[in-house]
Design a protein with these regions (language model features):
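Conserved mixed alpha/beta catalytic, RNA-binding, or beta-rich assembly cores of soluble enzyme
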Residues: 1-167
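C-terminal structured domains
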Residues: 142-210
């Protein structure tokens, strides 16, 4: 148990750093730090699967080694006897690298749409977007229903980052480019509404409890 604690408390962070620098050397220093912080936080979470599994791998390997050897060079033991433990660290690093890449692509997507919105004239003064779990409705300033684009093949602005059924809403808003989008919500803004806020910024007005 003391050996397990020693490895986790004094070696694990450096092992993670080494994996990140070796496999993702093309990431900026700040991006590498983000991945490292997420890995450390996750591995300290006692509810995570990897928390207990990696402890068991170290304990079993250490017990087997000590049974057959009188002395141990710790650095050699870690690098040559803890292959399963190292695979776990590799997996955790890859998981949060993928998360970072998706987040970066999402931000690039948002920035592209923001640039588009800011570069084009508005085609309508204002719209009301009634956003509900069961259905969403788009109304003009006279409260007449605006039809959504229903042909997915003709959606012009869909990216790899998508919002399933909300793609049609996004495409319609990007086609209309209203000066003001009044969003009527039943509950707190979800990820899609937050995305609309990021894209349309001060054009958005939120009304809760509608």
């Amino acid at each position: 148990n003391n050996l397990v604690s020693l490895i986790l408390n004094f070696y694990e962070e450096n092992l993670l750093k080494s994996i990140i620098k070796s496999n993702y050397f093309y990431f900026s220093e700040s991006e590498q730090d983000i991945v490292l912080d997420k890995c450390l936080t996750y591995l300290k979470d006692t509810s995570s699967v990897e928390y207990q599994v990696r402890i068991e791998h170290i304990y079993i390997a250490a017990l087997k080694y000590i049974t057959n050897n009188k002395a141990m060079i710790l650095s050699g033991f870690i690098h040559f006897r803890l292959s399963n433990y190292m695979k776990i660290l590799d997996y955790v690093v890859d998981t949060f690298v993928n998360e970072l890449v998706v987040d970066r692509e999402y931000k690039e997507f948002i920035n592209l749409l923001k640039s588009y919105v800011n570069s084009k004239p508005s085609n309508i003064n204002s719209v009301h977007f009634i956003y509900k779990n069961t259905s969403s409705i788009l109304l003009d300033s006279k409260h007449k229903k605006i039809p959504f684009t229903d042909d997915l093949a003709n959606l012009n602005y869909i990216s790899d980052v998508s919002f399933s059924e909300n793609d049609i809403v996004l495409n319609t808003l990007l086609t209309l480019l209203p000066q003001k989008i009044i969003i009527h919500l039943e509950k707190e803004p979800d990820e899609f509404i937050k995305t609309l806020i990021c894209i349309f910024e001060n054009r958005i007005e939120l009304i809760s409890g509608s």
